[in-house]
């Protein structure tokens, strides 16, 4: 999954999910400078530190993999999201999990208490908006998890109708690995 704020009212552009998009393009220093202050002043320092460290892991993974993914997009013509999804799926298969059935957001547990820890990391984002983003993440992941062929067809057709297919179809796990991504999944594994 990506930055939490992407999932706030994900089907419409708004200041909160635009912040998620903008942060994805910013230097990490912007977030980490704020995060340091948030952790130092947090009522529950352990919870705030846990969130900050999770963000560090995500940042390190993106920083390491995105240059390769973007080069592979140019080489293969496969979209960024699909390459990342295929890599995730290859790792799940290696661990004996079925990527079509495994719920990838099962670790997200929306609660007001957690939202109170997370919200201060994002300037101008409220606890209610953070909680809604957490719930939105669960909803979007349930929507995109299309183990049933009929649901898969409905989801992908809906993306086409909404004009979002090119950007979003790669977020829906393929029933079989995309042969164009096998090489990228093997290289990604070696670089991480």
Protein language model features and the residues they cover:
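N-terminal leader/auxiliary helical segments
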Residues: 1-190
């Amino acid at each position: 999954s990506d930055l939490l704020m992407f999932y706030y009212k994900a089907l419409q552009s708004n200041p909160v999910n635009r912040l998620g998009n903008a942060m994805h393009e910013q230097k990490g220093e912007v977030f980490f400078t704020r995060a340091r202050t948030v952790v130092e002043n947090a009522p529950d320092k352990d919870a705030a530190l846990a969130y900050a460290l999770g963000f560090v892991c995500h940042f390190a993974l993106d920083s390491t993999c995105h240059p390769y993914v973007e080069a592979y997009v140019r080489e293969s013509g496969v979209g960024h999201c699909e390459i990342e999804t295929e890599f995730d799926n290859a790792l799940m298969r290696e661990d004996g999990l079925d990527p079509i059935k495994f719920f990838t957001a099962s670790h997200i547990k929306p609660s007001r208490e957690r939202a109170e820890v997370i919200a201060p990391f994002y300037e101008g984002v409220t606890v209610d908006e953070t909680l809604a983003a957490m719930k939105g993440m669960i909803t979007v992941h349930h929507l995109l998890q299309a183990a049933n062929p009929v649901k898969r067809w409905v989801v992908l057709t809906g993306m086409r109708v909404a004009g979002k297919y090119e950007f979003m179809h790669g977020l829906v796990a393929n029933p079989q690995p995309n042969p164009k991504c096998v090489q990228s999944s093997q290289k990604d594994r070696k670089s991480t």
